[in-house]
């Protein structure tokens, strides 16, 4: 059947126009004309009004758009609801996670341990100014040191970038030493404690070591305990705490640093008055080889009121046993500092029968600044494992686990802490 709206079936244009005008005026549907030409067929729908096709299409489009928009809004509401639920689940957790560990800490434990640790770490960031005696004379630049009043001073250059590198290294070590308490001590040198500031501002330019150490300690994570040896040494800066001809501290300077460690860790401090002082005169240290006019030094060391034995393992793996932490045959000359634990060896273990030890064990990861320091720890630990990171060929974490060591002290002189090659050597202990 032909389309009832196809105007091609009308006889002529005039009739088509009339019928179109009729539809517009009376809004009635057009009668259909059959193809057999018998005349128009009456419409049997009793003049029921119909919407034009365009209006139908518009209605359908409007309805479809409303449906699409409604569905989109519902999907958006669903997404927002899901995200909100996830956010509330994360923020409403009962547990807090330490930023430097994968271990979850219950809120009650965090509340009791973190404030104490944070308070101790904050106290380590307070530095006093050493009151250095000054006769207002001027020195001169020697070889690798500034010479003033018969003593050599190694000038320091450091910045926040180097401080960040060192702190990052210590933080990394702590994370790898699972279940072990980690301490860090950075030791200032003679320039900081013996050379007047007026010279460091002029003929002997040297950066602030207090500022450098403070930057390091401030960047350590909360699981590392910084030991502020600086203030203890500063309080005694006009005593014989550094050698004149060498870059190391004296046995007395190391002792004051030890007292800072013992106090920071709430342990009994060894009383030097209960010990026996021994001296070797005529020490000419590392600076004396290249600079004239330096005052010759005296090396003092103290034997303890309890027994200490020493086992040294060399680079070949051979272990030797001694009945003292000091080399009994040490004598005057350029190598006298080596009397402390017999110098730099890969591994040295001190065994103590001090009543304060109570079976505790500690590892000291050090360079040569740790040699004069480590013997004092025998007052507080039954075993002191002294590891020279430059020569130790084992994995530190494995070694601590195998030997039941629960505490590790990283001890570095200020120059070492700001030297990349030293950091690389320490990195090798845990790689």
Each predicted region: which residue ranges?
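Extracellular glycan-modifying ectodomains
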Residues: 2-431
């Amino acid at each position: 059947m032909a389309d009832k709206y196809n105007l091609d079936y009308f006889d002529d244009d005039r009739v088509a126009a009339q019928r179109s005008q009729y539809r517009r005026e009376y809004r009635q549907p057009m009668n259909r004309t059959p193809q057999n030409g018998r005349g128009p067929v009456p419409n049997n729908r009793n003049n029921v009004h119909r919407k034009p096709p365009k209006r139908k299409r518009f209605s359908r489009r409007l309805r479809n758009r409303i449906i699409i928009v409604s569905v989109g809004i519902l999907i958006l509401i669903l997404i927002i609801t899901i995200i909100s639920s996830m956010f509330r689940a994360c923020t409403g957790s009962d547990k807090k996670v330490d930023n430097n560990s994968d271990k979850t800490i219950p809120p009650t434990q965090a509340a009791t341990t973190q404030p104490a640790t944070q308070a101790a770490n904050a106290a380590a960031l307070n530095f006093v100014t050493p009151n250095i005696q000054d006769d207002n004379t001027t020195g001169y630049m020697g070889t690798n040191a500034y010479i003033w009043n018969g003593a050599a001073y190694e000038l320091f250059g450091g910045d926040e970038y180097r401080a960040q590198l060192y702190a990052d290294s210590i933080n990394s070590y702590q994370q790898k030493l699972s279940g072990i308490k980690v301490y860090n001590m950075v030791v200032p040198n003679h320039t900081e404690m013996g050379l007047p500031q007026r010279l460091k501002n002029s003929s002997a330019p040297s950066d602030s070591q207090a500022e450098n150490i403070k930057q390091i300690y401030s960047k350590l994570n909360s699981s590392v305990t910084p030991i502020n040896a600086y203030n203890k040494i500063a309080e005694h800066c006009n005593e014989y705490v550094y050698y004149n001809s060498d870059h190391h501290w004296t046995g007395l300077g190391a002792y004051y640093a030890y007292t800072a460690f013992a106090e920071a860790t709430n342990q009994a401090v060894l009383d030097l008055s209960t010990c026996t002082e021994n001296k070797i005169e005529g020490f000419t240290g590392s600076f004396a080889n290249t600079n004239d006019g330096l005052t010759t030094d005296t090396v003092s060391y103290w034997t303890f009121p309890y027994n200490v034995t020493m086992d040294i393992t060399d680079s070949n793996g051979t272990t030797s046993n001694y009945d003292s932490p000091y080399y009994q045959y040490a004598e005057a000359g350029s190598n006298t500092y080596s009397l402390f634990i017999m110098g730099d060896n890969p591994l040295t273990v001190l065994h103590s029968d001090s009543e304060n030890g109570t079976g505790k064990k500690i590892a000291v990861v050090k360079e040569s600044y740790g040699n004069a320091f480590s013997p004092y720890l025998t007052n507080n630990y039954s075993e002191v494992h002294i590891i020279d990171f430059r020569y130790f060929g084992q994995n530190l974490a494995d070694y601590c686990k195998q030997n039941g060591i629960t505490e590790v002290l990283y001890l570095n002189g200020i120059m070492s802490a700001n030297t990349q090659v030293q950091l690389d050597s320490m990195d090798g202990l845990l790689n």
